[in-house]
Amino acid sequence: MEANMSFENDYYSPIQLFAEIEAYANTMDKSPDLDILRTIEEFDETLLSEIEVRTQSIPSPLVAPSVTKMSLPSPSPAPPNSLYTRLLHELDFVEGPSILARLEKINVDLFSCFPHNKHLYEHAKILSVSPSEVLEELSKNTWTYTALNLNEHGEMALPMPPTTKADLPSYVDDIQNFYLGELEAREKSYATMFYGYCRALAEYIRQSAIKDLRDARVEDKNIGACSKARQYIAERYYREAARFAKLLYVHLYLSTTRDVSQRLEASQMGRQNIFVYLKCEWLQERHFHCLFQPVIFNHGVVIVEGRVLTAPELRAQNYIRSEFGLPLIRCKLVEEPDMPLISPPPFSGDAPRASVYLLQCIRSKLEVYSLSHPPNPQLHVHKEHVHVQKLESPPNYGTTVEALLMDSSDRNSISPGDPVATTISTL
């Protein structure tokens, strides 16, 4: 197999590169010859000796599931910055702001493949874009809790690598289903926690409005308080709720992906020979860039959007994974001898950033209730919501997008999320 993919240096003329890709593609369309089979059978995973790289991955990952991690009780009303600091410590995520800052320096879509799990937000009236509806929810105990397990697990057990190549496609499908189950189980707890913080934030804002009216000359204090509270909610609540959501959901995606990926690394490490038979094809580049990947030791054929994955692309993706504490993806056919496993990807200030894809994923959750219970049937969002930008204005990819809701038909909008789509076959 190596004979068909030779990477001797960093430079290829267009003719050389096309010839190698064509030869490689032709090989994939035919039955493996004796030399290929011999290479597969003689594959030695010791060739993949660990190369010291800058990574935050936890060493010696275990196959066992992560232990229970209980939250604090739902927070009491407090200023936004105090609630944000509490959330940082409750998640044990002090590096959260620096991670969010890194997402501003990456042009890769890491998040749009994650499922939106909209069914978890259908009844979240506390997220309504109508300030009046938000205020109505403050008197209810729906959004309070005693403790939540932030390391909830799905119903599936971690699938183990197969012993025969015929079982590889079903194994990859099982891994993806396992991950989606783990993610949804945790997201239920994270969503409940988010509602608790939103309630505490909204109640603090309501109390601030009442306090500001105490010395005001208003004939009807009750009417004045209601009007002032709606105004304060419109001006402050949505911006701060979005800030909480960014921190909370980036932690959800990173912690779940780290835990599952480390377990996969441990379970697949001793059975790397079987993955030489794997042909993995990502139909879209964003599928390859997704934070979660079902195969850590992808030693077979790797195709992205119909072309062979290159070593520089693999190094750039592994650099991003190392930045976020994820195991590196190892590809024996792609890696170049005597070259580092990681290198920084290029960056353009004019291109979409990873932070924007994260915000789009979050927005899809925050908008669920209001889209299914619109205050005004003629509008996607309520006029009370002052942070909604004009839809005809193009999004500013270099800054936080403040609108919680955007027109999904907008041609400039980011592709909706979906599970990782991968075409799997065997050689």
Curated annotation (Swiss-Prot):
It is found in: Virion tegument; Host nucleus. SMART domains: Alpha_TIF. Keywords: DNA-binding, Host nucleus, Phosphoprotein, Transcription, Transcription regulation, Virion, Virion tegument. The keyword DNA-binding applies. The keyword ATP-binding does not apply. GO terms for cellular component: host cell nucleus; viral tegument. InterPro entries: Alpha_TIF, Alpha_TIF_sf. GO terms for biological process: DNA-templated viral transcription; regulation of DNA-templated transcription. GO terms for molecular function: DNA binding. Transcriptional activator of immediate-early (IE) gene products (alpha genes). Acts as a key activator of lytic infection by initiating the lytic program through the assembly of the transcriptional regulatory VP16-induced complex composed of VP16 and two cellular factors, HCFC1 and POU2F1. VP16-induced complex represents a regulatory switch: when it is on, it promotes IE-gene expression and thus lytic infection, and when it is off, it limits IE-gene transcription favoring latent infection. May play a role in the aggregation of tegument proteins around nucleocapsids during virus morphogenesis. Belongs to the herpesviridae tegument protein VP16 protein family. This is Tegument protein VP16 homolog.
